[in-house]
A protein has these predicted regions:
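Rossmann-like nucleotide/phosphate-binding core characteristic of flavoprotein oxidoreductases
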Residues: 1-25, 45-49
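Glycine-rich dinucleotide-binding loop and its adjacent helix/turn
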Residues: 2-15, 83-91, 97-101, 155-215
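Short, flexible hinge/linker loops that cap or flank conserved catalytic cores
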Residues: 18-21, 145, 197
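N-terminal Rossmann-like FAD-binding beta1-loop-alpha1 element of flavoenzymes
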Residues: 21-52, 212-215
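Phosphate-coordination loops involved in phosphoryl transfer and adenosine-cofactor binding
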Residues: 23-25, 121, 200
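Glycine-rich FAD pyrophosphate-binding loop
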Residues: 43-68
């Protein structure tokens, strides 16, 4: 009954492709900074057959999902953003905002050719070791069943919204959404604000952490 809280509101078009049944040298599960750095460094070492499997519609990890108004990183950009020298990039602010971080993620993937063999909008549903073939067999929700010589687990915990255990949450009739799935169709505006859709609304924010303060 809470499936709407985990749907991806940022996908503009569903990916239509045939299931993969091939073999790759390296499979990386997760397209956030961990997966991107792994893919980049492997590429620098000469690995060419790299496939990143990412549930979201693009690279970025937590910065793909968290696009709420005011979202920013509380660590200095020169420390937080990876591969700055490799991309010859200078952050625009001391504390980068979410759109810039997401853009940097995509630029990393572009530079290292990680889009070419990626499985976006794809979730791993199973993985087992084939001892006879000495390969991992990976299955996904898109009916993929391919093999990999090496697997790097780079999936984080922040892609799934944490709902509060409040009595009556499942029967509330007002409009609700999680900050990691911000509903701009309802609020209008963008990450900079201008939420005209909320002008005449009474809004309750559940939580008092950094996300609540920023948005």
């Amino acid at each position: 009954e809470f499936s709407n809280f985990i749907e991806d509101p940022y996908i503009t078009a569903d990916i239509d492709r045939e299931p993969f049944t091939d073999e790759v040298e390296v499979a990386i599960i997760g397209g956030g900074f961990g997966g991107l750095i792994a893919g980049a460094r492997l590429s620098e070492l000469g690995f060419e057959d790299i496939r990143i499997i990412e549930k979201g519609g693009d690279f970025g990890g937590t910065w793909y999902w968290n696009r709420y108004p005011g979202a920013a990183c509380d660590t200095e950009a020169y420390i937080y953003l990876p591969l700055l020298e490799e991309l010859d990039y200078v952050p625009s602010q001391k504390y980068a905002h979410a759109p810039e971080i997401l853009s940097h993620s995509k630029n990393i993937a572009e530079k290292y050719g990680l889009y070419e063999n990626a499985c976006l909008q794809t979730e791993v549903t199973g993985m087992r070791w084939d001892a006879l073939a000495s390969r991992w067999v990976i299955q996904t929700n898109r009916q993929d069943r391919f093999k990999a010589k090496f697997v790097i687990m780079s999936n984080g915990p922040l892609h799934r919204p944490k709902l509060p255990g409040i009595e009556g949450i499942n029967s509330f009739n007002g409009h609700t959404f999680h900050t990691s799935r911000w509903d701009y169709e309802y609020t209008d505006g963008d990450s900079n604000g201008a939420l005209e859709g909320l002008r005449d609304k009474r809004v309750a924010i559940i939580g008092t952490g950094a996300t609540a303060v920023q948005c």
